[in-house]
Amino acid sequence: MMYCENFSNAGVSLVIVSNGKAVTEIFRGSTPEELPDSITTEASGQLKEYFDKCRKSFDFPLELSCSAGATPFRLRVWEALCGIPYGETVTYGELASAVGCVGGARAVGGAVGANPILIAVPCHRVVAKDNIGGFSAGLDLKRLLLEIERIKY
């Protein structure tokens, strides 16, 4: 069974999805039919603390492998994203090297853009070598997240 809960803070609307054991998605938008569980409620509380600048990491359970777009390569990239510390960034090229795909910045960019769990899997911390780069949930949200973490871009 799938559970979902709307989250809204700082003008940002997100949907948190759980499989009853772990968060499987956080995406921008809203759903008219909420069915929260303890996992989505915990994630919502932690996201609120993050947006209020009171939390730098998340400890609710995540499940990346059940995403419809999960491939071994994407999973490797998504797991590497989890290692980027709060308040720091890496470039697409640096991330490509970190996952053993030297010269694969574009491939890594595709995997980053397919990340199913926004914010908790911090794809917003990946930037281009000479600019902010892209963001599947909109550059306005990426800028806000970088500002929350006091990252200059």
Task: Label each residue range with its predicted role.
Residues 1-102, 152-153:
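Basic nucleic-acid-binding alpha-helical/helix-turn surface characteristic of O6-alkylguanine DNA
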Residues 14, 126-128:
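Active-site and channel-lining beta-strand-loop segments
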Residues 34, 128-131:
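A short acidic, helix-capping loop that chelates divalent metal ions and anchors anionic groups
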Residues 76-80, 107, 144:
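Pre-recognition alpha-helix immediately N-terminal to the DNA-recognition helix
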Residues 92-96, 111, 118:
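C-terminal charged interaction modules
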Residues 103-117:
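Regulatory, non-catalytic segments
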Residues 119-126:
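Short Lys/Arg-enriched helix C-cap and helix-to-coil transition segments
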Residues 130-153:
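…primarily DNA-binding HTH/wHTH and HhH modules…
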